[in-house]
């Protein structure tokens, strides 16, 4: 099973490069997962962004800590017709949507899970224990985990915690692709962060002036989505029998 995971789509430039580039490479993969956490102006995902990604060839959309920023997607989260997965480890049983979904990929089961980290982020249920509970099921097939977290240590800990128990643990949220792509013991693909899909000449997606002035003046400044050419980052994976046999960073930059 060949799976492409694409990191956090950021704003209109991220949506543009996704919708232009993904259709050209989609035939190379059996399934595509896209994190859409920042696709609507840098914060969350709205209905049009979701539809655009699905039309481009995405088979599943994941989210993160900005999942609730746009209320127009709340009904979509709870409809099986929309393959969207929000973070699993929210305590409230009335939280819209689901934290995992299982897909049929050419006759094989692929389960996509979305988790939130807790270090330097808002309080949510323990992602390690939440994942342990899910893995008590025996009907998940090949399991892919999008771990949306800030701290490298927490992401690495999750990778080792799930080594040999899932097919992949790929981090999102920090927007910079890391060079630690590998296969952990037991056949679990791991990368601390897939990187983002958005403006290339930016500060993790934002127009340079706002963040730069904040550092220079130590005062708040307005942030906006940067313009210009965009990049697309992700991880290309190969799974066999519920295990990863290959993992490679994927990167494309517009001319």
From Swiss-Prot:
SUPFAM superfamilies, per database record: Metallo-dependent phosphatases (SSF56300)
pH profile of the protein: Optimum pH is 6.0-7.0.
Residues reported in the UniProt entry to bind a divalent metal cation 2: 37, 65, 148, 173
Cofactor binding remark: Mn(2+) is the preferable metal for phosphatase activity. Phosphodiesterase activity is observed in the presence of Co(2+), Mn(2+) or Fe(2+).
Active site: 66
GO molecular function: 2',3'-cyclic-nucleotide 2'-phosphodiesterase activity; 2',3'-cyclic-nucleotide 3'-phosphodiesterase activity; metal ion binding; phosphoenolpyruvate phosphatase activity
Annotated positions binding a divalent metal cation 1: 8, 37-38, 175
Cofactor(s) for this UniProt protein: Mn(2+); Co(2+); Fe(2+)
Family: Belongs to the YmdB-like family.
Function: Has a dual activity phosphatase/phosphodiesterase in vitro, with a preference to phosphoenolpyruvate (PEP) and 2',3'-cAMP, respectively. Can also use 2',3'-cGMP, 2',3'-cCMP and various model substrates such as p-nitrophenyl phosphate (pNPP), bis-p-nitrophenyl phosphate (bis-pNPP) and p-nitrophenyl thymidine monophosphate (pNP-TMP).
PANTHER family: 2',3'-CYCLIC-NUCLEOTIDE 2'-PHOSPHODIESTERASE
Protein name: Phosphatase/phosphodiesterase DR_1281
């Amino acid at each position: 099973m060949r799976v492409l995971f694409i990191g956090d789509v950021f704003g209109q430039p991220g949506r543009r490069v996704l919708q232009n580039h993904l259709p050209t490479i989609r035939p190379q993969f059996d399934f595509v997962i896209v994190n859409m956490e920042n696709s609507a102006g840098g914060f969350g995902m709205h209905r049009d962004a979701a539809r655009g990604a699905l039309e481009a060839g995405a088979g599943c959309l994941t989210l993160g800590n900005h999942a609730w920023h746009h209320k127009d997607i709340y009904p979509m989260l709870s409809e099986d017709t929309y393959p969207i997965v929000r973070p699993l480890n929210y305590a409230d049983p009335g939280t819209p949507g689901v934290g995992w979904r299982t897909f049929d990929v050419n006759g094989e089961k692929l389960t996509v899970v979305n988790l939130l980290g807790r270090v330097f982020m808002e309080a949510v249920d323990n992602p390690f224990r939440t994942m342990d509970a899910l893995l008590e099921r025996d009907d998940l097939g090949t399991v892919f985990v999008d771990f949306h977290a800030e701290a490298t240590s927490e992401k690495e800990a999750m990778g080792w915690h799930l080594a040999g128990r899932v097919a992949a643990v790929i981090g999102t949220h920090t927007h910079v692709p890391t060079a630690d792509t590998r296969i952990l013991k037991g056949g679990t693909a791991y990368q601390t962060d897939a990187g983002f899909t958005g403006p290339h000449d930016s500060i993790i997606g934002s127009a340079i002036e706002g963040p730069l002035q904040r550092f220079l003046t130590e005062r708040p400044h307005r942030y906006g989505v940067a313009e210009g050419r965009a990049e697309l980052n992700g991880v290309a994976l190969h799974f066999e029998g519920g295990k990863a046999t290959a993992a490679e960073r994927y990167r494309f930059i517009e001319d």
